Amino acid sequence: MKRRSIVLALILALLAPGLALAADLPTAKPEQVGLSSERLARITQVLRADVERGRIPGAVVVVARKGRVAYVQAVGFRDKTAGTPMTPDAIFRLASMTKPLVTVAALSLYEEGRLLLADPVSKYIPALKTQTVGVERAPVEREMTIQDLMRHTSGLTYGNRGTTEIYKMYPESSNVSSLTLTMDEFIERLSKAPLLYQPGTRWEYSLSTDVLGRVVEIVSGKPLGEFLAERIYRPLKMTDTTFLVPADKRARVAQPLPTHPDTGAEYKLHDPTVPRKFDCGGGCAVSTAGDYARFAQMLLNRGRLEGARVLGTKTVELMTSDHLGQISRGTNYFAGPGYTWGLGVSVREANGLAPMAGTAGDYFWPGAFATYWWADPKEEMVVVSMMQSPLGRHYIPLLRALVLQAIVE
């Protein structure tokens, strides 16, 4: 019976491609945009096999090239426990794929002259002016800046990225903290923790984008979710992207498997229908594959989509350029070799070096719950993959291999 339900879900999912996305972006047959239908089918085959093996509950993958969607597949289950098939309009917890959204919102304020990248963060959040560095509580040599927040060189960290005393003083993540702390309480806790290193001297993945989200609120005078809707979601017709899933969309939320496929440990994600105490810009948004594909296509189009301009072309160029230079990438630089860091995204430096397929100049960022996207200006390609699983890092190089091998001209 269990086997029959899996097969039924897979059949229904395979009938669903394009239903929710066809009206969102123009579509094309793969061969019309230099892709092979036969080779793209390998994506479906691999994901279907992983669903059958109990590795993932399901997935939605979108591949667009030359501005047209050539592949959309919804595979497996939206909720395996309930036996609900995956659909293209499933809503996923984005985790860190929230960060590029908030970075773009901040850059829209930068374009208006309302904040500058070199501004000290304390100009907007005075509580962060008196921070010290390390267990020695050394004074800062210079304050963290807006640019530091966008490129993760602020000196902040995540509490779950280490076991030393400094890490223990930080919140584990904003996904957890925003359920119990207000934004003021969150900032106060950060202000009392020493920085892990001097600002501008090392890359460290961190709560920086949550702080950036607060800066956006202060400068705009609006809650972060409201400002994101005003500057990004409504202009781009991202109708399902938000911080709080409304009651009438609850059934569309994708659910993970109840246990970790490798360890058997319980695996639970937050309920995106439960209100938070603040809009956390580092990882609390939800979206669909179709919505996020529109956002990624806007960036690939250098700031514009269907007549709506979100950013200027030079600002997108600034965002997707190297902002690390000779800054140390530390021991936890999981963007990996061959990639530098721009503003809110990781940017590929060369065709080689990285142990996965790609093109110099492509840019990406994933989410901890197995969401992933990238844009490739040279190949004129946007790819969005949505799952809810603890195995996200496995699928980053795998999806790149499966998608890019389908390019035939």
Identify what each model region corresponds to:
Residues 26-94, 116, 130-136, 268-270, ...:
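Short, conserved catalytic-motif segment at the N-terminal edge
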Residues 9-18:
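Bacterial N-terminal signal peptides
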Residues 1-8:
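Bacterial N-terminal signal peptides that target proteins for export
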Residues 36, 99, 288:
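Short, conserved phosphate/pyrophosphate- and ester-handling motifs at nucleotide-, phospho-/glycolipid
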Residues 373-374, 379-389:
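Short, well-ordered beta-strand elements
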Residues 26, 132-359:
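Short, surface-exposed loop or secondary-structure junction motifs
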Residues 20-22:
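Boundary at the C-terminal end of the N-terminal hydrophobic targeting segment
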Residues 41-48, 61, 67-69, 92-121, ...:
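Active-site SXXK
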